[in-house]
From Swiss-Prot:
It comes from Geobacillus stearothermophilus. One of its GO terms (molecular function) is inorganic diphosphate phosphatase activity. Belongs to the PPase family. Gene3D superfamilies: Inorganic pyrophosphatase. Signal peptide: none annotated. This is Inorganic pyrophosphatase.
Length: 165
């Protein structure tokens, strides 16, 4: 049986091109400006998370969705997960899922991070390697993993979330 990519609902907090880091306050049901990036850098893709997951850093599992155009905070995108970036942020593992919109025909053939232009992967890695430099915080970029590893990571984060409930 052939592998099928995971399809998830990505809850977007930060649109592509933004320098503002928004976070959703679940208790109050509002988006709050967490901070403006200290560095003159911009988010290279839609940035959000998967609801009902718990990553190793204690937050929901992060996801970047590569889109044709920016969306808005609160947008939910049906997303085909194509891999993830291993990284460490302030000493904690902080994987970043990578996906593409199911409902955009420009990405119909994209099933793996290998289907993206290598330059796009370099942009994403560079952003996360440098975006906290002027805050004096360190991040470390690890390896890229494919869709099968991403599916396993999602399942682990769902199980961790369910154990914490």
């Amino acid at each position: 049986m052939a592998f099928e990519n995971k399809i998830v609902e990505a809850f977007i907090e930060i649109p592509t091109g933004s320098q503002n880091k928004y976070e959703f306050d679940k208790e109050r049901g509002i988006f709050k400006l967490d901070r403006v990036l200290y560095s003159p850098m911009f988010y290279p893709a839609e940035y959000g998370y998967l609801q009902n997951t718990l990553a190793l850093d204690g937050d929901p599992l992060d996801i970047l969705v590569i889109t044709t155009n920016p969306t808005f905070p609160g947008c939910v995108i049906d997303t085909r997960v194509i891999g993830y970036l291993n990284m460490v942020d302030s000493g904690e593992e902080d994987a970043k899922l990578i996906g593409v919109p199911v409902e955009d025909p420009r990405f119909d053939e994209v099933r793996s991070i290998e289907d993206l232009p290598q330059h796009k992967l370099k942009e994403i890695a560079h952003f996360f390697e440098r975006y906290k430099d002027l805050q004096g915080k360190r991040t470390e970029i690890g390896t890229w993993e494919g869709p099968e590893a991403a599916a396993k990571l999602i399942d682990e984060c769902i199980a961790r979330y369910n154990e914490q409930k």
